[in-house]
Amino acid sequence: MSNNTIMLARWGMQAELERIWRICFDEEKRPTDFFFNNAFRPQDCLIYRAGGHIAAMVHMLPAAIAQDGKAVQAHYIYGAATLPEYRSRGYMGALLRCAGHVGLRRGDRFSFLLPASRGLYDYYAGYGYAPNFQTRFVTVSAEELRRISAGYSRRRVLLTYRQMNRLRGELLLKRDGSALWDERALAYADGINRRYGGARVCFGKAGETAYAFCRMAGPGLCEVTELMSRPETLPGLAANLLSAMPAQNYRIRLPGGGPLFEGRGKVSHFGMIKPLGGITIQKMIQGSNRPYLGLTLD
């Protein structure tokens, strides 16, 4: 009889789960510790036990999806990993199927994820996920940002996570199918970004706000992994970005079809989603405002 079991994790399993994380993601101790100290919850982690040991895991981080102007409960599949000696046995597929059942039982309407590589899109498609999210990648020179921010000087601003989340909701809630997070998720995204040498850059004036998460991606290149701003707040944010993270070029991730740097950049599928009941993918991708993922923690 097989001793293989799928179950929710329990407190006290962190050491074994951390070992899997570090082996599978070739991760250093500090970022690994940060996840398990700040984002891990056993009720959000499914494990596959084989022969008395944890062979694989998936984390189902609480999230939401925009639908008809409302936030609908969902989960984000994160940290999906199988130890090398247990791969190609179907353990991860079993966990993904189970995650759908567990999510539906707790009220989640969607499951979504960001494949670690292009080759994995086909793999996840086999478990019902579709490439719904789109991100526009725009590269902007420091010189262009200086022109945009002409007349603005750096103004030190630190928005609260509540302010950031409110702005994010205002910009994305009407973009059906987009991923929404809570303040806890924003705090985690900020913290893990800083552990990789990144920064949170903010702007605020007369009640209008903007923010960006950024990090250096190579010599002279700053990767802006999320930028939330209206056109009128972009100049002030650009001034603060130039000061906080000097670089020659800035590669910015933006929602597809948005007003910032309109018509520029390359639009790519960046994430997948699976409905757990109700709405179909086809309805969510109607219109010009393609669903946006963001805060992928990649």
Locations of regions flagged by a protein language model:
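Amide-forming acyltransferase catalytic core, primarily the GNAT-like/NAT-type
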Residues: 130-232
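Active-site rim helix/loop that mediates acceptor-substrate recognition in acyltransferases
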Residues: 14, 19-67, 176-202
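A short, internal acetyl-CoA/4′-phosphopantetheine-binding micro-motif in the GNAT/acyltransferase core
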Residues: 77-87, 224-233
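Conserved beta-strand in the GNAT
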Residues: 47, 53-64, 74-81, 112, ...
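Conserved GNAT acetyl-CoA-binding A-motif
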Residues: 96, 103-116, 246-256
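Conserved acetyl-CoA pyrophosphate-binding loop and the N-cap/start of the following alpha-helix
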Residues: 86-98, 232-241
